[in-house]
Amino acid sequence: METTNIILCGLGGQGVLFMTRILAETAMHRGQKVVGAETHGMAQRGGSVISHLRLGEAEGSLIRSGTAHYLLALDEHEAYRYLPFLAKGGKLYVNVEPGMFPRPEVGAHIKSNKIVYRCVAATKIALD
């Protein structure tokens, strides 16, 4: 079984750790091995939160830069911050209005690394 590397990021209070727990429990329920790590220093004050989730035959809990298969960003700015974690051909899901991402200066990086991205206005959907 291969390893699937997932980075989840956002700001304190957005539910990054909760979303990580849901994905981890779902994977375990399906019989997959799960390893993870999280960083949430100033999260209580709206600071950056990042969670590493590795499914399958992972050696260690941290995901190296350029090796994540998926990046799930609950905040647009955090998507830019953690974009270097994505592998070439990785998939990026961002909580932002469609058409508002990416910034032009980042578009070239996304295109050259064949990153597939999808914008979902998740906050707006949740509030409606």
Can you say where each PLM-predicted feature lies in the sequence?
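Active-site cofactor/cluster-binding pocket
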Residues: 1-128
